[in-house]
């Protein structure tokens, strides 16, 4: 079972991650990890921090000669901006007397609840750990599980279907054609857009909307569509609540900063339709197996993978740090004041799509481990291939 922990503050020396449970024998490269980190930094509407950081992962353990060795993998991502924060974020030398305390909580952030929960007299520690900067470590960790899945024929990708008022409906035929080649192909097509949208007109409108929001000192959220192809039927389980694949995927995506809603397939649209227009019919195709003319279940039926593309939609709220501040109050004086602005993005929806790809990878990998077990890539691959062949043969007629 893959599990990982991250550590580090947004303006501290570095972010780090420890990944446990990766099987031995998985070919990995620093270039692939860094590619995912670069993808996370992309997107129109990002703030000044992205001009400072050039994220790259340093591997400290768990990999030898380009392959995993089954032991915990430790990764470090240095924060270049640390040199500007050595006094404010010093670990041991005390600069408390000369460091300005942050006492005005920003609406929509972790500031107020975090300050009350942990008893700080300064909101800075809350700001720095709750920051979405932490997702760089999750992307690095997730890239390892993603690489493992790719070597088993399972791919993950995402696109952005809306930013603010702009919706990219996308051509179903275009999306289907890309997914036929694998979700990585769809991700590559999305990456060619500054906002990771597939439609050119939608891309132009989204960029204009981001520009307008920035001009007004405002921010924009949006909707992310995540796709996972090549997943065999039967991952997850209906037997216990904590083994349900859909709940595990939803939890992983909901744990991304600013994500406020998740659905599997067009779930909320399905809720407004009769069952006859929602459920996917089953067709037995001789020599091929079971096919569904639609995939409104989002690739999960009865909390298990159906064998179709897994489709997850996530709603990201607008970023809470705005240059046109909302009403707040000062914790030191208890007087009403306008909220303070912390350097931030106008829109980070495209980057959040990359983070979503990363966090679902360990979930699918763990569902594979639960089904097939194994400590080495080849052991798992052989068991998976045997299972796939058995499923195909059962319906070949």
From Swiss-Prot:
Pfam families: Chorismate_synt (PF01264). Pathway: Metabolic intermediate biosynthesis; chorismate biosynthesis; chorismate from D-erythrose 4-phosphate and phosphoenolpyruvate: step 7/7. GO terms for biological process: amino acid biosynthetic process; aromatic amino acid family biosynthetic process; chorismate biosynthetic process. GO terms for cellular component: cytosol. Its cofactor is FMNH2. It is an enzyme of class 4 (lyase). Transmembrane segments: none annotated. FMN binds at residues 129-131, 257-258, 302, 317-321, 343. PROSITE patterns: CHORISMATE_SYNTHASE_1 (PS00787). NADP(+) binds at residues 40, 46. It catalyses: 5-O-(1-carboxyvinyl)-3-phosphoshikimate = chorismate + phosphate. InterPro entries: Chorismate_synth, Chorismate_synth_AroC_sf, Chorismate_synthase_CS. Reduced FMN (FMNH(2)). Keywords: Amino-acid biosynthesis, Aromatic amino acid biosynthesis, FAD, Flavoprotein, FMN, Lyase, NADP. Its EC number is 4.2.3.5. Belongs to the chorismate synthase family. This reaction introduces a second double bond into the aromatic ring system. PANTHER family: CHORISMATE SYNTHASE. Homotetramer. This is Chorismate synthase. The lineage of its organism: Bacteria, Pseudomonadati, Chlorobiota, Chlorobiia, Chlorobiales.
